[in-house]
C-alpha cells in the first residue's frame, strides 16, 4: 500500500500557552491530516526534553513530556482557572518555544492543578488519599517505570536539578534505607510527578484514539540510547558498561570523519549487551512494549548502533580514542519479535554504513530511510529516487535537515543545485549557472516534493514546514549547535482546507491518497 504522512512535532502546534500540546490544535491537525488524505502523523519523541531542550536527550525512556499536557483541558476539569493561566508568562513570540520561560510557567500551573486535584478527590470521597479508579489503573499498569521516575524527579528537585551523579552517595548509589526515608518525607512531591504522567497518558490516548478512528497512524520515534542524566541510567546498573566504582566506563559517539576531525562525543552510557542477552533483552522488551502502547509505528534512531557502535572511554575529551564494537544484531530483534510479534519499525539507517549494517537491515526486513537533500552530490547516489526500494520511507529532509526552501536558497552547493535542477527537469540536462540561478525556489520545492511522492517507496513522510514552504525559521535542529533548536511553532490557522485539498491532490497523483479522505467533511 502506497501511503504518505506528515512530520509535525507536537511542540510545533499552535496554541496560547508557549508550546504545542494535546489540546484543540492536536485534534484539528488530525482532521487536517484526514482531509489531506494522509495516513501517518510522524512525531518527535514524546519524552521530556533534556539537555539543549532535545527530545533525544530525555530524563526518561518511558515518561511523557509534561509540557504537552493541555492546560485548557485541566481548566475544564476545574483544576485551573483562567486567572491561573493569565498570571503566567508564556513567551513573547507565538512562533517560537521559549523553553526557559516555559520551564517556570508550565510547572507552576501544573502544581496548582495537582493541588486542586488532590482537594477535588478529597472533597468527593472524604479522604485525602482516595483517587479515581483510572488513576490507580494507570499507576498499576506503569509501576515498572513510574515509581522510579517519580522518585528520581523528586530527588532532582530536592537537589536543585543537579545530575544524579552529583547527589549525595546514599541517593546516588540507591541506598534502600535512604530512598525509603526520602520517599516517606516527600510523598506529595512524588505524587505530583505521577499526577502529571497520568494526565499526559489520558490526554495523549484521547488524541491517538481520535487519530486512529480517522485512519491516521501515529509514527513515534525512540532514540537508541538513554541520557546519562536520566532515571534509566540511575536505576539501570548492570544494563550499562560500568567501571569498578559503578560509573560509566564508556560512552557513545561517532568517529572522526570529513566533517569533524575529533568525531562526535555524545556522552550517552553504552549498553552492556552481554548482560542484556542474559536477561533475554527484558529491558528492551519493556521499552518497546511501552512505546507500542503510545505509537502505532516506531522509528528507531541510529539503527546502525545495533550492528556496530563507536565506544569512547568516559574520561576521554574527544571521540578520537574510541573504537568500533559489535552490537546485538538480529539477536535483539528476534527476542523482541518473540515477545511482541511482528515489529512495526522503521530503521534510521542514514550515513555511511558498513556492509554488516546493510545486512542487518535486510535480515530484519525493516524499511530504511531515503533523504532527498542527500541525493544530489553527484554520481549514482543511493538517495536519488531511481535507487529507492519499495520497502522504504522517503523524506525530503528529516528534523536534522533544514527546510527545502532554505536548502535550495542557502544550503545546497552549486553542484547540488545543478544536479537537482537537471534531474528534476527544471533545466536542460547540462545547465549553465545562469539557468540554475533562474530556477525559482517554489518550483524547486514543488519538484522535490513530487519526486518524493513519486518514489517507488511504500511510504513518504513530508515535514509540515515543507508543505508550508517555510524557510530557515522552521529548521528544527542543527546538529552540533547548542541552543536555539526545537523551537519552531506553526502559525495559528496554518492547517487550512485549501492546503489540505492541495496536499490531497498532490498525493492522489502518485496513488498515495487515503481513499477515506473523500468521505471526510
Where are these regions (language model features)?
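Outer-envelope exported proteins of Gram-negative bacteria
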Residues: 44, 217-219, 223, 297, ...
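Surface-exposed amphipathic alpha-helices with a cationic face
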Residues: 34, 204-212, 337, 361-362
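Short alpha-helical segments and helix-capping/turn motifs at coil-helix boundaries
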Residues: 24-31, 202-210, 284-286, 379, ...
